[in-house]
Swiss-Prot record:
Keywords (A to Z) from UniProt: Arginine metabolism, Cytoplasm, Hydrolase
GO process terms (BP): arginine catabolic process to ornithine; arginine deiminase pathway
Name used for this protein in its record: Arginine deiminase
Lineage of the organism: Bacteria, Bacillati, Bacillota, Bacilli, Lactobacillales
Pfam families: ADI (PF02274)
């Protein structure tokens, strides 16, 4: 990394030097059973234990020499002037789907009254309950205030924020600032916008943008994998559509970030397989985890850029051979999540057995609960750093989902 390139990520496996996390906060305590689907959760984590698990995850990374950054801290550091701070508040409010002018005014006054920038950022992440606001006089209530009086939130929380992989993705020296699948998560990208616009280290045009949050088609970081300095992998999934991938790839090639080819993976469109990295991750120079259930239906396209146009070819050969040829290795091994047992594979994929974070070639952070997959990985010579995640996993994401590399050593 140099002063000109604060982002440097040219692989999935190079030694991890710097990573972005988000410690789960009060947004988790604003989950409630009636609105889990709306907020893209299946269960409610216990915040105190989730924070302990997340702190242990961060410490495990530090113990391996990784510098840990926090989203909430970088976002707070990006509010460098009162004018930028006020602009952030107004943009946040404009995207929060607030019902009623009087309600919006009361929330703005609440946020403007918070003096500490990090406290402000954490409050915007947590959401605002109606009970926190002064009672609006009946004469000032609009129709929406009256019709939706039973809904408890004036602004929804952002409980998915601890999955920092998705709102934006680091690619080479650039960043894809994503337009996300759901309204619930699309609001999360405001923090990346302010970091990469105003932060003293990461703002000011130092990081080229290869996708913009104002695009109308969806893409998420769990579908963006950097396999090598030459090759990217992208997923066409529940959360990322093909049109977004085409826009992303044109920008990457035009920005000349060094990549020569992209492998686009098309697979089942459902929550169980919401992102490519929930079913496929790179763990060593020549090894990948894969969920066996996707192998039969998987389609792969090779994409290159020639004469200012994308050239797309559907690949028909063996996946392992295709990966080996593109990575310049003799052989690639696909390690099946859960092994050959369909019950174990289904259970451990649901608990993110395939969602590993590689912090150096052959050194992988995993949830300890996926015992069958972990034993297979160890039998292949991989070093595992096992973390507890009984609460964290309730959000349906693993170590890769919970981390966004900012700097890796080249391989």
């Amino acid at each position: 990394m140099t002063a000109q390139t604060p982002i440097h990520v040219y692989s999935e496996i190079g030694k991890l030097k710097k990573v972005l996390l988000h410690r789960p906060g009060k947004e988790i305590e604003n989950l409630m059973p009636d609105y889990l689907e709306r907020l893209l959760f299946d269960d409610i984590p216990f915040l105190e234990d989730a924070q302990k698990e997340h702190d242990a995850f961060a410490q495990a990374l530090r113990d391996e020499g990784v510098e840990v950054l926090y989203l909430e801290t970088l976002a707070a550091e990006s509010l460098v002037t009162p004018e930028i701070r006020e602009a952030f508040i107004d943009e946040y409010l404009s995207e929060a789907n607030i019902r009623g002018r009087a309600t919006k005014k009361a929330i703005r006054e609440l946020l403007m009254s918070i003096e500490d920038n990090q406290e402000l950022i954490e409050k915007t992440m947590a959401g605002v309950q109606k009970s926190e606001l002064p009672e609006i006089p009946a004469a000032e209530k609009g129709l929406t205030d009256l019709v939706e009086s039973s809904y408890p939130f004036a602004i929804d929380p952002m409980p998915n924020l601890y999955f920092t992989r998705d709102p934006f993705a680091t690619i080479g020296t650039g960043v894809s600032l994503n337009h996300m699948f759901s309204e619930t998560r699309n609001r999360e990208t405001i923090y990346g916008k302010y970091i990469f616009t105003h932060h003293p280290i990461y703002g000011g045009g130092k990081v080229p943008m290869v996708y913009d949050r104002n695009e109308t088609t969806r893409i998420e970081g769990g579908d963006e994998l950097v396999l090598s300095k030459d090759v990217l992998a992208v997923g066409i999934s529940q959360r990322t559509d093909a049109a977004s991938i085409e826009k992303l790839l044109v920008n990457i090639f035009k920005q000349k970030l060094g990549f020569k080819k992209v492998l686009a993976f098309e697979f089942a469109n459902n929550r169980k397989f919401m992102h490519l990295d929930t079913v496929f991750t790179m763990v060593d120079y020549d090894k990948f985890t894969i969920h066996p259930e996707i192998e039969g239906d998987l389609r792969v396209y090779s994409v290159t850029y020639e004469n200012e146009e994308l050239r797309i070819v559907e690949e028909t050969g063996d996946l392992a051979e295709l990966l080996a040829a593109n990575l310049g290795v003799e052989h690639v091994e696909l390690i099946r999540c859960g092994g050959d047992n369909l019950v174990a594979a289904g259970r451990e994929q649901w608990n993110d057995g395939s969602n590993t974070l590689t912090i150096a070639p052959g050194v992988v952070v995993v949830y300890n609960r996926n015992t069958i997959t972990n034993a297979i990985l160890e039998s292949k010579g991989l070093k595992l750093i096992k973390i507890h995640g009984s609460e964290l996993v309730r959000g349906r994401g693993g170590p890769r989902c919970m981390s966004m590399p900012f700097e890796r050593e080249d391989i």
